[in-house]
Regions:
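Secretory targeting and sorting signals
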Residues: 1-30
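Beta-rich ligand-binding surfaces for carbohydrates and other polyanions
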Residues: 31-151
Length: 151
């Protein structure tokens, strides 16, 4: 029992020493990683999906993720991470997607140039979401417009 306690205390002391050690120059100069943001089940007008941000369907069966490579992709994790749909905008790191106030859902480069658009300006509805109904399971909707039908 005493040996176990001494071993644990030694491990804790080593961890504390490691945490107190200053970072190397290379690590200190590296840009901090931006944590992914979960946007719930819907994206509302004015919302932005930054690199690695995502939303999921109401039942959690589908995920729409803005990848760090610039590609906006809908996945079905339960089917082996099957790709249901993609904007095919990879190769543009730092890109983001926004559901604009005019109803258009657009992927922009980090410099603000459009790469892909849903072409739903003036369309009805107020959210981007993924359906889980039996009729159109996995369909991605921008407002009332289906961007792709079922997965």
């Amino acid at each position: 029992m005493r040996k176990t306690l001494i071993t644990r205390m030694t491990a804790i002391a080593a961890l504390c020493a490691l945490l107190m050690t200053p970072l190397t120059t290379a690590t200190a100069n590296a840009a901090p990683a931006r944590p992914a943001t979960y946007h719930g089940h819907s994206l509302f007008r004015g919302d932005v999906l930054g690199p690695d941000d995502y939303l999921d369907s109401a039942g959690g069966n589908f995920i729409l993720r803005m990848q760090t490579d610039g590609n906006l992709v809908e996945y079905w994790p339960g089917a082996g991470w099957k790709v249901c749909w993609a904007s095919n905008t990879n190769g543009w790191p730092g890109s983001y997607a926004t559901y604009q106030g005019d109803g258009n859902f657009v992927v922009y480069t980090s410099g603000g140039e459009p790469l892909w658009a849903s072409n739903t300006v003036g369309g009805g509805g107020s959210t981007v979401d993924i359906s889980e109904s039996l009729r159109d399971y996995g369909s991605l909707y921008v407002g009332f417009t289906s961007i792709h039908y079922a997965c």
